[in-house]
Amino acid sequence: MADPVVVIGGGLAGLAAAARLAKAGHQVELYEQSNALGGTWAPYQLDSGITVDDAPSIIGFPAPWRDLFRKSGRPLEAELARMGYVLASAGPQKMIFADGAELTLPADRGGQYAVLTDAYGRSVAERWQQLLDQLGEAWQTLRGLGLEAELHDHRQLNRAARRSLFGRRKTLAELATSIDHQHLGAVIRSVAYRAGSLPEQTPAFAAVELYTARTFGRWQVQPLEIDSALDVGRSSILVEALAARLALRQVRVHLDCAVGSIKIRSGRVVAIETGDGGRPAAAVVVTCDPWQIFDTLLPPNAAPRTRRQLRKLRPAAAPAITHHRAAKPPAAQVIETITISDAGVPTVNYLRPAADGGLCTVQDFNQTTSCASYGIAWHGFVSWLRHPSVTTQVPGVYAAGPFSPAGPNASQVVLSAALAAYSCHDYLGAIT
C-alpha cells in the first residue's frame, strides 16, 4: 500500500485539502495538535450552553465553498440540507461613524448607488460606483495570482497586471483619500484593519473585498426550519460539514497529536515525526503557522529563501472577540453593525437569535494581538511576494492557509487549499 498523504493542521485549509485529496483517491491522514477540528472556526460552548464560534457570521464569496464540496462529494446545498441548514442571503451591513451618522449599505450595485445618492448625493455615489468598478479589474488580475493559480514571484506581474493592481494609488490610505469623503474613506481604511494590517501599509488592491461583497453578495448559514433559528449565522456549521466529509472519505484524523518535524531524504519528504514516533508520508500539506513550518518542522537547511523572506514578515493583528447575551433580533437573521472611527478602525457586532433572546459576537479591532492564525500583516506591496508559495522549495511539501498569497479570508484560505491539493496530486502522479 502506498504511503499516505499527511495533512498537518485541522483548520479550514487542512480540512479542505484533506477532503479534495481523499476524493482524488489518496489515502489521507490529518494531524491536529488540539482536541477539535476547525482552528479559529471551531465551535465551542459558552457557560450558558450556547454553541458559538469566533468566525464571521457573514460569509462572502461562496463559490470556493461550493467548489470544495462539489469536488469532494455531495454539493454544498445538499450537504447542508442533509444537516438541516441552508446558505441564505444575508441582510445589509449597518455602519455607524464617529460623528454618529449611520449608513445601511446593501450589497448590490444598484442598491448601493441609490442609498449613497440619498445619503451623500449623486457625485459621491458615482465616485464610489466607479471605484468599485475599477476594483473589479484588479479582482480579475488577482484571480491568476494566488487565487486560482499559484503566485511564485514578481515575474508573474506583467505591465498590465501592475497597472490594474496599483494604478496611481499605492496604498489603501491613499485610496481612501481619493474618494474625498470622510465616511466612505473610513470604510475603505477599515478593510486594512479587518485584514489585521494598517491602511498605510496595505496595498490599494486589497480593497477588492468591497468589490467581491458587491458582486457575490453576503451569506449566512441558517436552519431550513426558520422556527428553529438558534444556529442562524453560526458559520462553524461549515466546519462540521467538512468534518463529516472527511469521515465519509475515510480520512484518518488524529486529534491531540502534534507533529514535531518533517523528515526529508534524498531531497524529498518521506515521513513526519510525532510524539508516538515516525509516520511515513508520500507528501505533506502543511497548514499551520508558517514560521513553525519553516523554522521548526522542516530541517534547518530546507527552503532557505522562504526562511529569509519570513524573517521580514510578522503575523497579522487579530481582534479581541467576545460573546454576550443581547435582546433578540426582530428577524431570524444576522444583523451586522460596524462602528468605524474616523481613522477607519472598526468594531464589528454580529447579533443573531439565541435561546431566550439574542447573542452578540463582537470583533474589536481597537484591541488586537499578533496571531499567525489570522494571516500575515501587510508591509507594503513587496510583503505579498514574500508570502510562502503553495508549492514550497521542498519536493512533496505544500503550504496552504491564511498566510498564503491568496489572502486570509475564509474563501481565500479554501482556494489556497485547493491549489495545494492540485499540486500535491500532480506531484504524486509524477513520482509513481
What positions do the PLM features span?
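N-terminal glycine-rich phosphate/pyrophosphate-binding loop and immediately adjacent elements
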Residues: 3-140
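Glycine-rich phosphate/pyrophosphate-binding beta-alpha loops
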Residues: 56-61, 193, 319, 402-413
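General small-molecule cofactor/ligand-binding pocket signal
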Residues: 86, 252-256, 398
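Rossmann-like flavin
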Residues: 99-103, 107-204
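Active-site-adjacent "gating/activation" loops or surface patches in catalytic cores
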Residues: 187-225, 392-395
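Mid-domain catalytic core of redox enzymes
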Residues: 231, 260-357
